[in-house]
Amino acid sequence: MTSLAGAVPRMMRPCPGQNYPRTGFPLEVSTPLGQGRVNQLGGVFINGRPLPNHIRHKIVEMAHHGVRPCVISRQLRVSHGCVSKILCRYQETGSIRPGAIGGSKPKQVTTPEVEKKMEEFKRDNPGMFSWEIRDKLLKDGVCDRNTVPSVSSISRILRSKFGKGDEEDMELDRKEQEESEKRAKHSIDGILRERAPVSPESEEGSDIDSEPDLPLKRKQRRSRTTFTAEQLEELERAFERTHYPDIYTREELAQRAKLTEARVQVWFSNRRARWRKQAGANQLMAFNHLIPGAFPPAAMPALPTYQLSETSYQPTSIPQAVSDPSNTVHRPQPLPPSSVHQSSLPSNPESSSAYCLPSGRHGFSSYTDSFVPPSGPSNPMNPAIGNGLSPQVMGLLTNHGGVPHQPQTDYALSPLTGGLEPSTAVSASCSQRLEHMKSLDSLSTSQSYCPTYSTSGYSMEPVTGYQYPQYGQSAFHYLKPDIA
């Protein structure tokens, strides 16, 4: 197929799809409809379609031989819900045929011929029960399994035809109920012995019409197993050794504890579930110990609120950038709004206030700050700050209202080292900045923490100088109102 130069070639029509065999795809099976899927047990099913009839026969046959539904599910690779539904329907109706897909079942209407037969049976034998009439209808060939009325329908028709009193009806219903409980509806004696001969034509029909005709034991509720103290002790010792015992261990344990292997298996399953629940609760309790204050109670020292015990961090070297006064910036704590509003900015970073923050070993907290005034008078309205505070005022600020200090090692927070370090170089930095203040010589040996931040890791902008107003200690009362 040729095309002109510059023309856009048209797409060719795709050829019909080839029917290649589907192989190697784990979730799809080659079926005539192409809808095959594989369930979690590895069995093949078609969504929305009932199970094949031979599998239904096999389910009923295995249940007749006493195989448990869970074992049937694993061996035939059919879901447990499907097995239970088939067995329950067979127990109630004696049929393994699947129910109608969608909608409700059509109401079965008894024909007049069948009603006449039932009346004849009742006249010939007034003591005949409804289930006996139903079996005789099947035996005489009046009805087949698809058209035979139920026991309740036969009882209702006979009650309306013969018009017995209420007491007689109740007595009859009670006797029929007791008799039906004694023998199954579709037992060997009731069905196989009285089954009508099957013609060869019907044998050639579909396998759906053929029913297994096997009696199933009436499903009963099992009472809960009560274990003795010796049995529980034996089981607990085995659970301490392993949570998942194999079949040999379970059988040996069942012999020693005088239990069945199935009971041992169920006990281990329940015990594992209880163990997982307890383990989760213990982990939650361990985590809750960390929530109050974000620290366990054992880590908090028994000291006053604003005084922490001496820490045991290993001393490390401090970078030169921290020791250089020109490369350090001291982060202040928030101050009252009245003392924060300033009209002018400092001309250089050196004019900003230096703050020595007493901090604990767990980082910044709400402890009282000891403030150091700036090196130069940055606020002309308050020259007393530039000349230095009085020793009495500084004593109030540093002693926190009489709370005694304990000897501690000075530590500095540095973003470069990522930990608390001895602030020997930082103390020297603070002393260089405060050497011109004659009235603050006592602060060079005060036990305070100077958290420093290097400009190499943080961008600096001119910071407004934080000043105290004329009224002395009002800022101190604002910060710590609870300290007298």
Swiss-Prot record:
Entries under InterPro entries matching the protein: HD (IPR001356), Homeobox_CS (IPR017970), Homeodomain-like_sf (IPR009057), PAIRED_DNA-bd_dom (IPR043182), Paired_dom (IPR001523), Pax7_C (IPR022106), PAX_fam (IPR043565), WH-like_DNA-bd_sf (IPR036388)
Name of one Pfam family that matches: PAX
Keyword Glycoprotein attributed: no
Coiled coil location: none
Predominant location category: nucleus
GO molecular function: DNA-binding transcription factor activity, RNA polymerase II-specific; RNA polymerase II cis-regulatory region sequence-specific DNA binding
Gene3D superfamilies in the record: Homeodomain-like (1.10.10.60), Winged helix-like DNA-binding domain superfamily/Winged helix DNA-binding domain (1.10.10.10)
Listed transmembrane segments: none
Keywords: Developmental protein, Differentiation, DNA-binding, Homeobox, Neurogenesis, Nucleus, Paired box, Transcription, Transcription regulation, Wnt signaling pathway
Acidic residues composition-biased segments: 201-212
Annotated PROSITE patterns: HOMEOBOX_1, HOMEOBOX_2, PAIRED_1, PAIRED_2
Annotated DNA-binding residue span(s): 34-161, 220-279
SMART domains: HOX, PAX
CC annotations in GO: nucleoplasm; nucleus
Basic and acidic residues bias (residue ranges): 172-196
Tissue note: Expressed in the dorsolateral ectoderm during early and mid-gastrula stages. At late-gastrula and neurula stages, expressed in the lateral neural plate, becoming progressively refined to the neural folds during convergence and extension. Expression is also restricted in the A/P axis, extending into the midbrain but excluded from the forebrain.
BP terms from Gene Ontology: fibroblast growth factor receptor signaling pathway; hatching gland development; nervous system development; neural crest cell fate commitment; neural crest formation; positive regulation of DNA-templated transcription; regulation of transcription by RNA polymerase II; Wnt signaling pathway
Subcellular location: Nucleus
Residue ranges with Polar residues bias: 314-330
Annotated segments matching region Disordered: 165-225, 314-354
Induction conditions: By wnt-signaling from the posterior mesoderm.
Region (RED subdomain), start-end ranges: 113-161
Record's function text: Probable transcription factor. Promotes both hatching gland and neural crest cell fates, two of the cell populations that arise from the neural plate border. Acts downstream of msx1 to induce the neural crest, cooperating with zic1 and mediating signals from both the wnt and fgf8 signaling pathways. Induction of hatching gland cell fate is independent of zic1.
Family named by the database record: Belongs to the paired homeobox family.
Protein name: Paired box protein Pax-3-A
Lineage of producing organism: Eukaryota, Metazoa, Chordata, Craniata, Vertebrata
Record gene name: pax3-a
